[in-house]
């Protein structure tokens, strides 16, 4: 047993040039852990609260000095003296100290920074890797990467409505080869876009953000890139989409306004469109296909294609066990996106993954659009044997940091490492 002796936070920058919280935890035995907190662009209304200063004269109101102060002046006093390995106790104490259902008093960004830094310090204390500390002897499955190589929606300044178009190298024999395949497809996509005279600037998550005529043209362009890279779409590489539909849902009319295409659709018309897309293209996963409050639409989508396609709830579930439990009971979706900062503690994150698995739902460990060099989610993915990770294109240091950590973990596991490819989607018809 080793006691936490110091907790210290500071304001640093994320990948979008916005402030975020960094926390360091020290123990009496000299162990140390550091964590940086990510931030989202498209956020669910039920997410835990990210505390920002609101001072327009400083970082356009996005400073996090208040959250930093909450760590240094309030949370530290509560956490110092805890056994560093008492993760549940540490997280429970911070939740109680905050006292709100959405961590709005102290800020989820303050609480999460301490939660993750404590876990890292505990791993350091025990002389093990973070994935070993969190997963014990059974953490061994390297995730299939869900690589966002073409961006639209809130992640790019273009006329593509769907937020993310991704590739999943399901035919790779291991993670190392999956990463290589993804990188080669990304380079092939750049060549395809250049050949069409399109912009090859990148979005927040490292993918390209060209002005395309339609969402379907984005799919066609990626299909071409996969072939040009020498791979077979549908066999070696499958497609995934994050529609982030809440971003183009009009709550007054109850319809989806895809302004890039100049199309307005009802919930049922959206479901029909997805049916057409999965018939035409090798799409294995659709995230937030409908608005986070359109549960009737989600139910219809699940009934129509939920046995063939992974239907991921991001804004729908916001890594929250209460929301997930309701979704499971109502038969909504079949997968949950896991974002540590949506819920605000490591303990609650692991609880959500466990609940999903028990219900036969898959869990996709995810980054945010505003990221840092922190690679904790890579360790969480392996520790929990989640089987999937969504952390952007294999470009930009903030994204590559996670991929490189997974390469290290795969090396460290050696012959014990597993990569499940298509079998990752254990709840779909083969």
UniProtKB/Swiss-Prot annotation:
Short name of one Pfam family: Enolase_C
GO biological process: glycolytic process
Positions bound to Mg(2+): 242, 287, 314
Keywords of this entry: Cytoplasm, Glycolysis, Lyase, Magnesium, Metal-binding, Secreted, Virulence
Gene3D superfamilies noted in UniProt: Enolase-like C-terminal domain, Enolase-like, N-terminal domain
UniProt subcellular location: Cytoplasm; Secreted; Cell surface
Residue positions of the active site: 205, 339
Binding residue positions for (2R)-2-phosphoglycerate: 163, 339, 368-369, 390
Matching InterPro entries: Enolase, Enolase-like_C_sf, Enolase-like_N, Enolase_C, Enolase_CS, Enolase_N
Disulfide bonding pattern of the chain: none
Free-text function comment from the UniProt entry: Catalyzes the reversible conversion of 2-phosphoglycerate (2-PG) into phosphoenolpyruvate (PEP). It is essential for the degradation of carbohydrates via glycolysis. 'Moonlights' as a plasminogen receptor. Binds plasminogen when expressed on the bacterial cell surface, potentially allowing the bacterium to acquire surface-associated proteolytic activity, which in turn contributes to tissue invasion and virulence.
This protein's name: Enolase
